[in-house]
UniProtKB/Swiss-Prot annotation:
Annotated S-S bridges: none
Protein name listed in UniProt: UPF0390 protein C24B10.18
Record-stated family: Belongs to the UPF0390 family.
Domain of life: Eukaryota
Ranges of biased composition (kind: Basic residues): 19-31
Organism classification: Eukaryota, Fungi, Dikarya, Ascomycota, Taphrinomycotina
InterPro entries (alphabetical): UPF0390 (IPR019034)
One matching Pfam family: DUF2462
GO CC terms of this entry: nucleolus; nucleus
Location of region: Disordered: 1-32
């Protein structure tokens, strides 16, 4: 027969806390991005980024052109904004 009592294990939940850092409390939102390590992948990524940029610029110019044809010159000034606000208050619009 063994002599002495068994050593009791400490409660494992007491050790789980550990250090709570600022980053672990509030992680950043959004997708994570890992840069490619191969030269071909880097080249493809830059080409895709340039294509996306040119398409966005082209679409914005197209939409601005269509809007200016329908409405006229697109300008926002303080005087026009105040005049529009007066018309809305008076109900002329």
């Amino acid at each position: 027969m063994a002599q002495g009592e068994f050593k009791k294990k400490k409660n494992s939940s007491a050790n789980k806390g550990g250090r709570v850092t600022k980053h672990s409390k509030n992680p950043k939102k959004g997708a994570r991005y890992c840069a490619p390590r191969r030269a071909a992948a880097i080249k493809d990524h830059t080409i895709n980024a340039n294509i996306t940029k040119t398409l966005n610029v082209r679409n914005e110019k197209l939409i601005a052109g269509i809007a200016s044809q329908q409405v006229g010159k697109l300008t926002i000034t303080k005087a026009l904004g105040e005049a529009g606000a007066k018309e809305l208050k008076e109900g002329k619009h």
